[in-house]
């Protein structure tokens, strides 16, 4: 009885049909990148704003001031190291204290309102609302007043998105295994579109946050299921390069995003531009089939056979009647637990290091991306260049992992990222070209580390625990994404370069730890926990090759 992989070889492992489906699904990586890093442009800090009290508003109306005149006459002067253009952002003069009458503003002069106070010194009070922006509604910061005491809410928007990713990984990942890949993919695309439109027209901040969370849930569903569909309809030899190329389309999304943001002047327009393409993916219902491998495991052999024949026809192949019964091996394991991943020494070491690697990759990668929004300079050009820098990372991975193995490039990429972050933090601001060059190396390093951890994670777990182990460890990626914005923005408020030091320390430690992982180059995938325990031993090359494990057979 032929296996599914043998049938796939017969119909073509990466023929015209697979290439078409692959290209269509790769576009999901572009839109997922929009969602993943879009906060950099949605939440851009306004250049010019100040706190406007009720008396200042009334006085501006009476005197007929322009916004600039109002700012010059009523905003408190800068104090300490604060630059002049930031005057009056988080404090305001209590102009209504000029006298105790109801018409306090009548005592204030249009030429010099502060002259009504002794020594021209009006009382200062913290701003609790009423900010005025030079460009109202241009970003979510000005839309929902996410400044001063409310600045932490901007961090919350990205943390909530990552919480949605984490939720989607478990809920929609399970649903895709139970109800089908393409069904969940299409539902997720619809969910991303609907929730994204609601986000764009959210009447208040709570509604914005709730639907941004839901968009994260569905967004993770599109990314996971498209990745699984592609890897399940191509041959085993193509899976590695297919996985890397999909991530290159994610990078393509990062490159395209600044162009979209540059030509659209407000955050609602940007949100719609990065959301509406998800509705186009619903057309895939007619061109992207269900995974035939999944159909066989769900005892839906007739449908799987129809799809295989469709693939064969498109690829110019022929599936003979000998393939009327096809088997696929299912992992015979039920209810795996975290204890299975830490019970034995080698499994425990691999699990803890991989969890830290996922966490570090997410924190450093997202931190470096979002940092572009707070360091000044031309955000659009800087963001575009940072995206272009990621493209060589995939090429370097393809050139090194089969020659040098997994462990050395994995460690080197983390160490390069860590050292680059530390060096950038202490370079003088006057040599901008050198700071940019070193920071670029750091971005390239962490991009490579992020892509390699996907591969290494799957190669270090046995068949019976692979899906569960990868899901659990990669969950630390989303957890890192929840922490990253708070870590970046709050530490940057203390010292702009402090987040870089934290990122550098984390990545450097990770680079050292991954050298403790066993090398998996040229070694068959482990099938049991015993195989994992033997990795790194002189006989590890035999792991997973001659062992037999109980399997259940699903057939056509």
Swiss-Prot record:
GO MF: monoamine transmembrane transporter activity; neurotransmitter transmembrane transporter activity; organic anion transmembrane transporter activity; organic cation transmembrane transporter activity; quaternary ammonium group transmembrane transporter activity; spermidine transmembrane transporter activity; toxin transmembrane transporter activity
Main location: membrane
Motif (Proline-rich sequence) on chain: 289-293
Effect listed in the UniProt record for changing residue 289 to A: Decreased TEA uptake
Glycan attachment residues as annotated in the record: 72, 99, 119, 322
Signal peptide as annotated in the record: none
Any one GO CC term of the record: endomembrane system
UniProt xrefs under Pfam families: MFS_1
Keywords tagged on the record: Cell membrane, Glycoprotein, Ion transport, Membrane, Mitochondrion, Nucleus, Transmembrane, Transmembrane helix, Transport
Biophysicochemical property: pH dependence: Optimum pH is 8.5 for agmatine and MPP(+) transport.
InterPro entries: MFS, MFS_dom, MFS_trans_sf, Orgcat_transp/SVOP, Sugar_transporter_CS
Record's bilayer topology term: Multi-pass membrane protein
Effect of residue 363 to F: Decreased TEA uptake
Segments crossing the lipid bilayer: 21-41, 182-202, 241-261, 269-289, 381-401, 468-488, 498-518
Tissues in which the UniProt entry reports expression: Expressed in liver. Expressed in intestine. Expressed in kidney in proximal tubular cells. Expressed in placenta. Expressed throughout the brain, including cerebral cortex, cerebrellum, substancia nigra, medulla oblongata, hippocampus, caudate nucleus, nucleus accumbens and pons with low levels of expression detected in nearly all brain regions. In testis, mostly localized to peritubular myoid cells and Leydig cells, and weakly expressed in developing germ cells.
Localization in the cell: Cell membrane; Apical cell membrane; Basolateral cell membrane; Mitochondrion membrane
Superkingdom: Eukaryota
GO-annotated biological processes: cellular detoxification; dopamine transport; dopamine uptake; epinephrine transport; epinephrine uptake; histamine metabolic process; histamine transport; histamine uptake
Catalytic reactions on record: (R)-noradrenaline(out) = (R)-noradrenaline(in); (R)-adrenaline(out) = (R)-adrenaline(in); serotonin(out) = serotonin(in); dopamine(out) = dopamine(in)
Entry domain remark: Contains one proline-rich sequence (Pro-Glu-Ser-Pro-Arg) that is required for transport activity.
Its biological purpose: Electrogenic voltage-dependent transporter that mediates the transport of a variety of organic cations such as endogenous bioactive amines, cationic drugs and xenobiotics. Cation cellular uptake or release is driven by the electrochemical potential, i.e. membrane potential and concentration gradient. Functions as a Na(+)- and Cl(-)-independent, bidirectional uniporter.
Family that this chain belongs to: Belongs to the major facilitator (TC 2.A.1) superfamily. Organic cation transporter (TC 2.A.1.19) family.
General remark: Mediates the uptake of clinically used drugs including neurotoxin 1-methyl-4-phenylpyridinium (MPP(+)) and platinum-based drug oxaliplatin. Plays a role in the anticancer activity of oxaliplatin and may contribute to antitumor specificity.
Protein name as it appears in the record: Solute carrier family 22 member 3
UniProt gene name: SLC22A3
